[in-house]
Amino acid sequence: MGSIEEEARPLIEEGLILQEVKLYAEDGSVDFNGNPPLKEKTGNWKACPFILGNECCERLAYYGIAGNLITYLTTKLHQGNVSAATNVTTWQGTCYLTPLIGAVLADAYWGRYWTIACFSGIYFIGMSALTLSASVPALKPAECIGDFCPSATPAQYAMFFGGLYLIALGTGGIKPCVSSFGADQFDDTDSRERVRKASFFNWFYFSINIGALVSSSLLVWIQENRGWGLGFGIPTVFMGLAIASFFFGTPLYRFQKPGGSPITRISQVVVASFRKSSVKVPEDATLLYETQDKNSAIAGSRKIEHTDDCQYLDKAAVISEEESKSGDYSNSWRLCTVTQVEELKILIRMFPIWASGIIFSAVYAQMSTMFVQQGRAMNCKIGSFQLPPAALGTFDTASVIIWVPLYDRFIVPLARKFTGVDKGFTEIQRMGIGLFVSVLCMAAAAIVEIIRLHMANDLGLVESGAPVPISVLWQIPQYFILGAAEVFYFIGQLEFFYDQSPDAMRSLCSALALLTNALGNYLSSLILTLVTYFTTRNGQEGWISDNLNSGHLDYFFWLLAGLSLVNMAVYFFSAARYKQKKASS
């Protein structure tokens, strides 16, 4: 019999090995050199300031264009209210559609870091083109002469909209990757880092709104009082700073490896399950095909536990007699792993939750369209200062800046006592609260418009279309409520689509979340078009005419409030039936 020391030695060595392992992140990430990342030297909050700085400056650049774009279209390109609003929402929709391109490239081939780097360059080129279109005399549209406003030339349109849609492409490559790349800096297998990651999403959105605050206040004033060349040039400079901030943090980052095309994997499950449509799924789920390794067959992805819904798709993981005899399991178009099948199941389960974001985004789109037009029909003077209507977006941003720390420091600890959830509310609960608050926002906007129209009628301003002498500050409540809705819904959505998505589809799922913004903007454009069509028949003014005093913008806001209410009811029904993802430990 050996000594006590000899018997204890293996246990000591095992403990040292375990301690050494915990020095490194265990979520499959690597450092810049491709080695397992040391927790002490990489990721976590050490890397986040560079990512948050990048996001803050990039959002300042984006909102520096988007926040007051409708004013440029109406005053410089001489477009009507409906045409300008449609152009804005279509462009914003495209900005949230192009993330699908960046997401597929990031998840399948380049990884999030290099995708951000590449599309940042495209973004900067677009910003530069837009600045030139507002600065170079030959590229600027002619000014109005009295009531006559000459149309912009085809070359001027091409330069302006070319730059605008290069920005849409550039931001599309960045959007689905930055929040996920930031969350990648926290090890999912470490309980402490998981809590920090939940906090990261709050401060990520906080950074977005710091950039938006500068844009919606200072930049809007510069654009309308010091010229659009300077007003577009400053955001271009900040886009350059965003790129610099991102690259400075490179040595500190943790990187997740691309896992191959998610679209191919989804297609393989569909094809394999169809090919085995006559095969019976065994009652014992352990008989379904899965690799024996700790990690899944998908690069950079943990295994996902089997679930009993969508059982038809399980046929793709049934090992046929032919495959069992040959021992050849390599053809993924005939046989898929349980993890691969579960990836598709997760996307299917997410769909009803995902769809709720479309109506919410249609409501959010009003901040840069109809809220601005409503403000232009009000008294924008504060003392001797002329306040640009788009600058009211500052109150939405201020609301977010107030609500984020309030939520993170006070609401979460309080909610934790009642819900038992470490982060206060689950992502689904948080999003549901945001949907309810969005209904209140549209109701507030409608009430302000009712008051404005009554005053216009009492003062005889209906025919002239002159701004009504009611302070634009009456709009503050609707902006402030919208900011609160954002903190609950958009941040909850960010976290939901990161946590619930398969490991190798996180950029794609972030892009799908952003796609709701695109569809929401397109839906807003569609609703505007339909409302205009149906309310202007028989020679009527319509709800949204160029003279808002003779229209009924309040009806439009009530319509959106009603749609939001229905959307909320459908969401709660779907959320009650949602099954959470379970990754194998």
Curated annotation (Swiss-Prot):
Q: Where in the cell is it found?
A: Vacuole membrane
Which GO terms of type biological process are on file? dipeptide transport; peptide transport; protein transport; tripeptide transport
The protein's matches in Pfam families, at most eight in alphabetical order, are given as:
PTR2 (PF00854)
Activity regulation reads: Inhibited by leucyl-ethionine.
Q: Name one GO molecular function term.
A: tripeptide transmembrane transporter activity
Q: Name one GO cellular component term.
A: plant-type vacuole
Positions of transmembrane segments = 91-111, 116-136, 154-174, 200-220, 228-248, 351-371, 387-407, 431-451, 472-492, 511-531, 556-576
Main location class: membrane
Q: Which PANTHER family match?
A: OLIGOPEPTIDE TRANSPORTER-RELATED
Return the protein name: Protein NRT1/ PTR FAMILY 8.3
